[in-house]
Curated annotation (Swiss-Prot):
It comes from Dictyoglomus thermophilum (strain ATCC 35947 / DSM 3960 / H-6-12). Keywords: DNA-directed RNA polymerase, Nucleotidyltransferase, Transcription, Transferase. GO terms for molecular function: DNA binding; DNA-directed RNA polymerase activity. The gene is rpoZ. SUPFAM superfamilies: RPB6/omega subunit-like. This is DNA-directed RNA polymerase subunit omega. InterPro entries: DNA-dir_RNA_pol_omega, Pol_omega/Rpo6/RPB6, RPB6/omega-like_sf. The keyword Transferase applies. It catalyses: RNA(n) + a ribonucleoside 5'-triphosphate = RNA(n+1) + diphosphate.
Amino acid sequence: MKEIDIDTLISKIPNKYILTVVISRRARQLFEELKILKTVARDPLILAMEEVAQDKITYGEGSDSED
């Protein structure tokens, strides 16, 4: 498994608090998807961090879609 460098994540999303929220929300989404599919996969938290590091996840201020 490739190690995820925190500096890489911070370079993608400079605010550590926003970074934490983005990663945790994505990890929850992945967990729910895996639960529905009943798939055993890697840790959703690690997957979410990898997605941020690979620029697969972006965020925008004011784009909070929590209902």
